[in-house]
C-alpha cells in the first residue's frame, strides 16, 4: 500500500526540443488558433466541428483519418472549421481498460509512460505535418499539459475532471479554448462554476513551482448528457436545455459565453449512429432561436475510419477500441449535411 517509483520520465522541455514545430508550423498554428478563438468570441460565425476517434490508438490509422478530414476541411472551409480529436488519454469509469496511448503506446502491452509521452507528441506532430490541422485533446492529467502546450489548439476537460480544482486552475493558465463538460450528474451550475474558476487568476503549485495564471477568457461549456442515480442516460442537447443554459449564462459575468454540444456519450446513450440526428436537432435549435445560435458555437462528434468498436485484440484497422464511433462514410455525409444547413 504505497507508491513504487519505477523510473524517471522525459521532461517536457527535452521532449519539445526533440520533437518540435517548424517555424512554418508555428506560424500556421497562430493563424488556426486565431480562427478558433474568433468563433468562441463571436467574431466569426463559422461552425466549430471537433471530430475524431474516441481514442487515438494507432498513429497510422489516426493520421489517415485526419488526412481525409483535411480534404473535407477544404471543401467546407467557408462555413465550418474542423478541429480533429486526437485523444491520447482516456478516463475509465472503473479504472479498467485501455487508458490511451500515453499509458500504453501499444494497447496490448504493459504501460510505459516514457514511450507513451513520446508517442503522444509524435502523433500530434505527424498529423500537423501531413494535414496542416491542429488538434484537440482531453486534459486528463493536468501535469501533462507542458508536453503538448505548444501544439494543441483546443482542450477538453471531461465530466469526471471538471469539478477538480487542479484541472480548473491549470486551464486558467492556457492560451487556447478549453471546453468544460457538464459533470456526469448533469448539473449546469458545476459546469458554469468550472468556467468561472478557469477564467479567473490563480496562484498554486504546479510541477514543482509556485505559479500564477492570468485566467482563460476562452473557457466555455460542453454539454455531454448526464447519468441519473439509476444509471440511465439523460440527454441535454434539446432545445429546452440550450435555452436554459443561455438563461444561466445571462445571469453570470463570464467572458465569451459559448457552448459546444457533444453528440455522443450520454447524449446518444453511446449509440454512435444517433450522432447525426442529434447534430441535426442542434442545428435546428440554432435556426429557430438567435440566442441559441449565438451561444452554440459547434458540436463534438466521435468518428473513425470504420463504424462501431472492437476489442483491443481484434486488430481491425481504423476501428475504435473504446467507445463506438461513426465510420468514414457517415462522417462525410454528416459534414456535408452540416455545411448545407449553415
Give residue ranges: language-model regions:
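Internal helix-turn-beta structural module
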Residues: 304-342
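N-terminal beta-rich core of secreted/periplasmic extracellular enzymes
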Residues: 25-42, 72-83, 89, 120
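Acidic (Asp/Glu)-rich catalytic clusters
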Residues: 40-43, 70-77, 126-130, 213, ...
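Short acidic, Gly/Ser-rich segments with clustered Asp/Glu that frequently serve as metal-coordination loops
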Residues: 54-57, 256, 264-270
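Active-site-facing alpha/beta catalytic cores
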Residues: 66, 79-244, 265-271, 275-281, ...
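N- or domain-start disorder-to-order transition segments that initiate the globular core
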Residues: 1-41
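Conserved phosphate/anionic-ligand binding catalytic regions in large, soluble enzymes, centered on
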Residues: 48-61, 323
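Conserved, mostly hydrophobic/aromatic
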Residues: 52, 261, 327
